[in-house]
A protein has these predicted regions:
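Juxtamembrane/interface motifs at transmembrane-helix termini
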Residues: 88, 172-173, 228-230
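Membrane-interface coil-to-helix junctions
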Residues: 24-119, 143-163
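Start-transfer (signal-anchor) and selected internal transmembrane alpha helices
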Residues: 1-33, 237-239
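Membrane-interfacial, low-structure loops and terminal tails that flank and connect transmembrane helices
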Residues: 1-9, 181-185, 225-238
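Transmembrane helix-loop junctions in multipass membrane proteins, especially transporters and channels
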Residues: 38-39, 100, 178-179, 222-230
């Protein structure tokens, strides 16, 4: 059964399915990584993402600057020409606090965390949308095993924004639900801003597509809630 007619409450049963989904994804990832190896390729992942992040960390220790104007990489270049790599991400900034640990440790761990986090978010979102536990679980598993996630250990900027796009969809569901407008007057808006900001922070090249996806999702939701919004809310209250 694809849809469930029951109220979409998150119960202990759902916690079990969510835990099972994340555990299955973690087992698949760690079983595919050879022993004594990083979850990353020697080409794009190590030569670009790890090397540049490590240089930035060393430069920060030497100068105290988070945004250097100039880097010595590639014979010397403007730092902002490398900004599309998303080096203000939480994993890179967190590595600054642990100088004795390799940068690769943080980038690898964060990439794995984001894959599992995205799969869990998709399960939760579909469950809240009224899909059955089976459908939500299967879709979450398909997400975890999607072919595009080979980029998680290569060009990570191609996929590391996806969990925050799903989080943006979750926030839009709450914003455009007039029945919960009184309960969620500000929080979903903050969540949407947070989600889109992190999409930019991780991969601003892909933010335009994320923004278009959110606009299309809003267009999908508006007819569904049009009657309720007219009766229950003023037009301005949808947003503020």
């Amino acid at each position: 059964m694809i849809f469930d007619t029951k109220a979409a409450k998150f119960t202990l049963k759902n916690v079990f399915f969510l835990s099972l989904l994340i555990a299955a994804g973690a087992i698949l990832i760690f079983s595919l990584v050879p022993g004594d190896c990083w979850f990353g390729s020697k080409t794009d992942w190590y030569s670009q993402h790890v090397t540049i992040a490590d240089y930035m960390r060393k430069n920060f220790y030497a100068t105290g600057q988070l945004f250097p104007d100039f880097t010595g990489l590639g014979g010397g270049t403007d730092f902002y020409s490398l900004s599309y790599y998303g080096f203000m991400r939480p994993d890179v900034l967190l590595s600054y606090c642990f100088p004795n640990l390799p940068v690769a440790f943080f980038i690898q761990g964060y990439a794995i965390f984001e894959i599992l986090f995205g799969g869990g978010l998709l399960y939760y979102w579909l469950h809240k949308k009224g899909f059955s536990d089976f459908t939500s679980f299967v879709c979450g598993f398909f997400y975890l095993t999607a072919n595009c996630f080979f980029q998680a250990h290569r060009q990570i900027i191609f996929v590391n924004y996806l969990p925050f796009l799903i989080l943006a969809f979750l926030c839009l569901d709450k914003i455009l639900n007039p029945e919960k407008a009184s309960l969620y007057s500000i929080r979903p808006h903050i969540g949407l801003i947070f989600s889109l900001f992190f999409c930019i922070l991780h991969s601003f090249y892909f933010f335009p597509s994320c923004f278009v996806a959110c606009i299309l999702y809003i267009c999908h939701l508006l007819p569904q809630f049009k009657n309720g919004m007219v009766k229950s809310c003023q037009a301005g209250k949808i947003w503020w």
